[in-house]
Amino acid sequence: MDDGTSNKIDMVAGGTTIMKALVVYDSKFGNTERIAQVIGNALGSSYEVEVLQVGTMVPDPFEGLELLIVGSPTQQFNPTKGIKNFLKSLPSNGLKGIKVAAFDTRLTIEDIKEVAILSFFVRIFGYAAKPIANGLKRKGGELVLPPEGFYVQGMEGPLVEGEFERAEEWARQIIAAQ
């Protein structure tokens, strides 16, 4: 039953408490947003899920939270400034007791191989998901799966065929890891 509030902390359905999950993302061309929505929908079978763009965070989104997933496009081998600021803004041990996971969107291996210097820098600096995961762990979160990357065609996308299905499968793996 909806009591008119947009941010329910827990629901009780048939005597069982539904766990709360939050998917926070930033997106430049819409690809990361689409992956975040797919992940949120897939988690909906086991969680009460909110999917929010990093700049639209609600007050106290972590109250009652059991799972936090953060995603960003890879820009200059890092998460976006918005995601970096979000991670910095979290209090020390602010994610203690919360399961966490991280993902990014990135160029395909084929696109990277076409530019030798890009291949070199990717080998050195990597992608956005790993720094996101490290930031979540530094704030006390418990990483449930290794960081994941989803592929886009070229700099702006679209997503490579099959990435929505991979995102759904990754979300199912997160549920199974609980």
Pin down the residues of each PLM region.
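A short, well-structured beta->alpha microelement
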Residues: 47-59
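Short, Lys/Arg-enriched N-terminal segments with co-localized hydrophobic residues
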Residues: 3-18
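Cofactor-binding loop segments of dinucleotide-utilizing enzymes, especially the Rossmann-like FAD-
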Residues: 26, 54, 103-105
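FMN-binding flavodoxin-like domain, especially the glycine-rich phosphate-binding loop
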Residues: 42, 46-50, 64-178
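Flexible, glycine-rich phosphate/dinucleotide-binding loops
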Residues: 30, 58, 109-111
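N-terminal beta1-alpha1 ligand-phosphate binding loop
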Residues: 20-46
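Residues that form or flank phosphate/diphosphate-binding pockets in enzymes
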Residues: 30-34, 60, 78
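Short, flexible coil/linker segments at domain boundaries that flank nucleotide/cofactor-interacting
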Residues: 16-18, 62, 95
